[in-house]
Amino acid sequence: RLIIGSDEETGFRCVKSYFEHEEQPALGFTPDAMFPLVYAEKARATFDHKLEFKSEEGNFDYKLVKFNGGQVLNMVVASAEAVLKGEARDIEEKFDKFLAAEKLEGEVKVSDVITLVLKGKAAHGSTPQFGINAATKLAEFLNTLSLDVNGKNYVEYIATRLANDPFGKVLGIEYSDDEMGASTYNYGILKYDAAEKIGVISTDCRHPKNFDLVSKLATLKEDNMVIEVTSTKEAHYVPKDDELVTTLVDVYRKHTGDTKNDAFVLGGGTYARCLKKGVAFGLLFPGKQDTMHQANEFLEIEDLLLATAIYAEGIYRLCCE
């Protein structure tokens, strides 16, 4: 059976609805990852860091009016923007020096307000260590300025507790095991609005199946911040020695001659987790450029043809032998 989904990036509603009306296949695979094969996918949790606003007091040079970065949780923020009120003075020079030191791009726009824009590097939210989070970088710069108390509390928390730490070490929520690897944290949607008293950092965590993240988060006591869990999803796991896994890996090796790479665990989520017994099988080959979730995403034609041959034999081996 060929099942075509249309909502993979935003909740799998399509496949969930399909299985409410149709019987699940006994087993299956999805071409939504990498070869040789993904036999397990980490658990996922999303949670918000929410700023507790205080009354304005003290002197400051700039007021943080707005701060925005990211549109979806499962991508590293590629562009972020901050709006300030205050005298421009030498802020453009300071920002240019910061960008040069970090080897990043951005710009300053001055009108009745000061707008700072910083460009990072997108990556999949399950591997934030491979991207450059524009929002946390912009917060690092803003943290060097004299800001109003709420703006300062917001950017200081990001700059000192979250920035450059995709594994949660600073907050004390790091965890890893030998089979599923390390927990990762992507700060994917950040929004601050002084007028509406909104200061939120929405986070996407991928973690091993044996880590109780919710209980760990409940123990955190962060100044000026409240942490609220918004969703959880259990890990997906098919034993590595299951016949589904060993058969498909054998087909892959027959067609590629690759005996070095083996089935592995993925931080990302695929349609495989919608099946009681499903795996992600290709179709990015080892050593090939991964442009997933980036501008100009592409696949080489010869890889598509090779993958097609692998899939054809894989389906035959699973269904006809």
PLM ranges: what are they?
Residues 126-198, 202, 206-214, 226-321:
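An extended, acidic, His-containing surface patch that forms the Zn2+-binding/catalytic region
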